[in-house]
Structure formats: C-alpha cells, structure tokens
Regions:
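Outer-membrane pore/translocation modules
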Residues: 68-160, 189-197, 235
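Residue-level signature of outer-membrane beta-barrel architecture
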Residues: 50-52, 80-82, 91, 124-128, ...
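Outer membrane beta-barrel transmembrane domains
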Residues: 172-211, 220
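Cleavable N-terminal export/targeting peptides
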Residues: 1-22
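Transmembrane beta-strand segments that form the barrel wall of outer-membrane beta-barrel proteins
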Residues: 25-31, 56-67, 87-95, 102-106, ...
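Outer-membrane beta-barrel initiation region
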Residues: 20-51
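Short loop/turn motifs that connect adjacent beta-strands in outer-membrane beta-barrel proteins
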Residues: 19-20, 53-58, 88, 127-133, ...
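Outer-membrane beta-barrel "beta-signal"
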Residues: 204, 230-243
C-alpha cells in the first residue's frame, strides 16, 4: 500500500511538472470556419489552455469577439493527442446579439432549446516528413444541429484534408478541401454547413513569421471558397500574443 501511494504521488508530480499554461491572441479581419464567415470586421480570438499528461492532454477556453460588438463566442474544449492522432471535443456557444437561436441561456443543455453545440473531431497527421497529409472527421454530436421540426439530431459531419504544398525560406502554403453531410437526414438533406451533401470549404493559406527586433509575429493570409453557397472570403491575420 505504501509503495502504491508513493507511485501515485510520484506520477502526479511528474504530470504536474510537465503541465504548462498557454495563452495566445490573434487579430483577424474576420472569423472563418468550415466554409462560413462567422463574423466580419476586426475580430479578436483568444485561446487559454492548460496542457498536461506530458503534452498529450489539453483543457482550454476559447473566446472570440469583434470590435462592432455583433459577434460574441465562448467555448470550452478538451483534446487528447499522440502518435499522429488527435481527438478533440468543443462545447461551442456563439451568443451574438442577432443570433436566430437561443443566445440568452448559457447553461441550457436541453437538446430542443440549447443555443450551443458539441463538435467532436478526430484528426490524423501522417508522420512521414515527405508526406505530412492531415485528415479530419468532425461530427456535431449534440445541440443546435436539429431537423426542421426539432425532433431529431442531424449529426452534421465535416470531413477535411489539408496538405502543405510549399514550405521554404520561412514561407508555408497549406491547401485544404472539406465536404459536409448529415449522418441523419431526418426528412431532408440539409446540414449545419449547407443544404445538400457536398464540398463546402476549400482554402489556400500562406503563413510566415515576421521578425521585428527580438519579437516574432506570425502572420497569414487565407482565401476560402464555398462552392455550395457560391461565396468566397479573404482573411488577413496575425498572432499578436503567444505565451
């Protein structure tokens, strides 16, 4: 018993020693997500997280808002990663003032009434340096992803592939494509990202770290196209804080 207790204490001490707090803040001209322009204007996105279990697990809080006050979002998330795999669960709550769903009850988790949704994602990044392809499967498991009559969960799913097509002299260019569909049609083909199954997101993102004296400023520009909605968006952003 004494040995077991000592082992538990030693394990806890090891995990604690490896644990780290992280804070990052990004400034973008809009907020883009899976073929959707969630918000426009000057958007501030903040991520505060705690990494433990030797870097394999992360608990985090994510918030976003724009300077006009028309966009407000506050999320919680958990991620587990190792050997190229990463599982994440995001409890997402966008309570923007003009929302057409329940944006007034933060703690309402009733499936028929809630304004939030739970998005679960499994990623895999190939570990070969010569083939760093990223594959991703995301399904909304709960929340405001309902049938037209609000009697069933649609389980809208987004599948995505991304590949770094260029990486040289500090520049990186990532190309990605994503499609969406509902696992449960529940009367029709509409899903969280569109009206029918199909491609809803293509992107080309160019990133580079700018050196300003001793300060490093990661910047990016991204073009995003949604063939299903016949829309396109352009984003410019920078990570202004990374701790």
């Amino acid at each position: 018993m004494k040995r077991l207790f000592s082992f538990i204490i030693a394990s806890a001490a090891t995990l604690t020693a490896a644990a780290q707090m992280h804070l990052s803040v990004e400034l973008n001209n809009n907020h883009l997500w899976r073929g959707i322009e969630v918000a426009d204007g000057c958007v501030v996105e903040t991520d505060l997280n705690y990494t433990f279990a030797k870097g394999h697990m992360t608990l985090g809080l994510w918030g976003g808002t724009n300077t006009q006050g028309t966009y407000k979002e506050f999320n919680h998330y958990l991620s587990i990663q190792g050997a190229g795999f990463k599982f994440s669960a995001w409890d997402t709550y966008n309570f923007s003032p003009d929302a057409t769903y329940n944006n007034r009850q933060y703690f309402n988790y009733s499936a028929h009434e809630t304004g939030r949704f739970l998005n679960c994602t499994l990623d895999y990044r190939f570990q070969q340096p010569q083939f760093p392809l990223l594959l991703s499967w995301s399904t909304i498991m709960f929340g405001r992803d309902r049938s037209a009559d609000n009697t069933a969960q649609k389980y809208s799913t987004f599948v995505y592939a991304e590949y770094p097509v260029y990486k040289k002299d500090g520049w990186q260019v990532d190309a990605g494509v994503g499609g969406a569909f509902a696992l449960n049609k529940a009367g029709d083909d509409h899903h969280f990202y569109g009206t029918t199954p199909g491609i809803v997101h293509t992107q080309l993102k160019v990133s580079r770290d700018l050196k300003i004296g001793s300060y490093t400023l990661p910047v990016h520009v991204m073009g995003m196209w949604n063939p299903q909605s016949d829309k396109a968006f352009f984003q410019v952003g920078a990570q202004i804080i990374k701790l």
